[in-house]
Each structure stands twice: as structure tokens, then as C-alpha cells.
């Protein structure tokens, strides 16, 4: 390959990459404008005038949607799960129960909100096998084609009959 071929190939490759980036950005912008709810030409002009004058006739805080947090959690569809409506916007400190931001996977919980209290208390762990009690009665179906074999009986794995408490 000559130097000219390398330069031309590199230029074509850079152009293709830039065109792909521009196409993705245009697609994202198109999705943003197409999926924007409740805004048509007249509303957009009114909002631009309000922004210029610093006035707002209607509040910009979105209304509470009872199904939004359940959709983010993967627990629901687009229909509200409860019939009660939320009287407050979602951003206030005293949140409503139907659209609580505390249920979403994107909310970072502080130490006082964690069930363990932020690691201040000890959690106990009880082994599944006790010397005096034997194995617990779990009714599990064994695979029929592939039997499970263990290299040892497993009794030496759990020898402590007491609950084990560790720092979390």
C-alpha cells in the first residue's frame, strides 16, 4: 500500500464514522421531538414567548403519574395500578404512595433508609444443616436424566449448629 492509499482509506473511514455519529444524533433528536407529549405548534410558540418574558401561566411541574414508578420497576404496564390519584407533584418531600420515587431503581438510598440501618446492626445467618436436627426437609425434584453427584457427603461443610453472626 502506498501512502496515498492509506490517507484516502483513512479519510473514507473517518467520514463514515462521522456520518454514523451524525445519523445517531439526528435519530435521537427526532425521537425526542416525535415522542414529546402535548406540544404542538401553537403550544411551542406560547412556551417560547413565556420563556422570553420569564412568565409561566401553567406550572411546569409534571403531574403525578401513578404508573410511572411501577413501569420503571418492571412491575406494571401503562395502566395505573391503583385508582387513587396523586394530589402532589412527584418532586416534593412528602411523596405520594402511588408514584413514589423511592421505588425506582435509579433512586440512591441513604444509610437511614436501608433495612440494615446502614450496617450498624448485625445480621444472623443460620446454616441449613444441624448436627442434631439432620437435613431440613426440602422437597425438590431431582433431575431425571442427569443425576447430581457430590465428591463428599457434605456433612463436614456445615458443622456449626449455632447461627453465625458477621459484620455486614
UniProtKB/Swiss-Prot annotation:
- Signal peptide bounds: none
A Pfam family of the record is: FAM163
InterPro entries, alphabetized:
FAM163, FAM163A
**Organism's domain of life?**
Eukaryota
According to its UniProt record, where is this protein mainly located? membrane
* Subcellular localization(s) per the UniProt record: Membrane
Establish whether keyword Cytoplasm is in the entry.
no
Spans through the membrane: 6-26
* Keywords, alphabetical: Membrane, Transmembrane, Transmembrane helix
Q: How does it sit in the membrane?
A: Single-pass membrane protein
Per the record, its GO cellular-component terms are: membrane
Could you say which protein family the record assigns here?
A: Belongs to the FAM163 family.
> What is this protein's record name?
Protein FAM163A
Give the gene that encodes this protein: Fam163a
